[in-house]
């Protein structure tokens, strides 16, 4: 039995939830998100509280109910407050610059990298070595951050590359003769 599915999702002020069969739509101040719920899971809305229960008492039903509850909670948090991920660029000459829906990166390659941002994502560059990715969809924000990091992941010898702001890179010692 999922402990996550047992706790309900409380709706903050300004957030609306519409349940239409297996579709759940969440609307808030920052935007709106939709999610298709699995047929083994039932979602109900009563007095500003969304509760998730499986149709049957199977292990798979409870697992899917827990996953659905976590996804709905992330949707509610996203439309109310939004999500953000911070990246740092470490390395000589590594720079980032946001221009509209394109993130221009100089990462030590012979060419600049132009990353096209998906719909619903905004990027700020407070300094040339910092990137802040914002959006209402937690999965999309994390995926964009992972895509940008994948251009030049931090290497273990000098620590150069693109890393998350809270990431600790394990350093290795160079081979000695």
From Swiss-Prot:
One annotated GO molecular function: rRNA binding
Domain of life of the organism encoding this protein: Bacteria
The keyword Ribonucleoprotein belongs to this UniProt entry's keyword annotation: yes
Biased composition (Basic and acidic residues): 155-171
Listed Pfam families: Ribosomal_L6 (PF00347)
Region (Disordered) location: 154-177
GO biological process terms held by the UniProt record: cytoplasmic translation
Any single GO CC term annotated in Swiss-Prot or TrEMBL for this entry: cytosolic large ribosomal subunit
Keywords (A to Z) from UniProt: Ribonucleoprotein, Ribosomal protein, RNA-binding, rRNA-binding
Family: Belongs to the universal ribosomal protein uL6 family.
Function: This protein binds to the 23S rRNA, and is important in its secondary structure. It is located near the subunit interface in the base of the L7/L12 stalk, and near the tRNA binding site of the peptidyltransferase center.
HAMAP family: Ribosomal_uL6_B (MF_01365_B)
Oligomer and partners: Part of the 50S ribosomal subunit.
Protein name: Large ribosomal subunit protein uL6
Organism, as annotated: Alcanivorax borkumensis (strain ATCC 700651 / DSM 11573 / NCIMB 13689 / SK2)
């Amino acid at each position: 039995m999922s402990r996550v599915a047992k706790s309900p999702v409380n709706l903050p002020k300004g957030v609306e939830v519409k349940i239409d069969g297996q579709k759940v739509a969440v609307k808030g101040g920052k935007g709106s998100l939709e999610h298709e719920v699995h047929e083994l899971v039932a979602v109900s809305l009563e007095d500003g509280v969304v509760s998730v229960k499986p149709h049957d008492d199977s292990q798979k039903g409870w697992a899917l109910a827990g996953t659905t509850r976590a996804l709905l909670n992330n949707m509610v948090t996203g439309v109310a407050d939004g999500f953000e991920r911070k990246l740092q660029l470490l390395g000589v000459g590594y720079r980032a610059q946001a221009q509209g829906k394109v993130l221009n990166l100089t990462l030590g390659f012979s060419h600049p990298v132009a990353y096209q941002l998906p719909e619903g994502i905004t990027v700020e560059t407070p300094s040339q070595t910092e990137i802040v990715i914002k959006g209402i969809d937690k999965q999309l924000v994390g995926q964009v951050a992972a895509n940008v990091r994948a251009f030049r992941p931090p290497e273990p010898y000098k620590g150069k590359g693109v890393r998350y702001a809270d990431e600790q890179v394990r350093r290795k010692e160079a081979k000695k003769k």
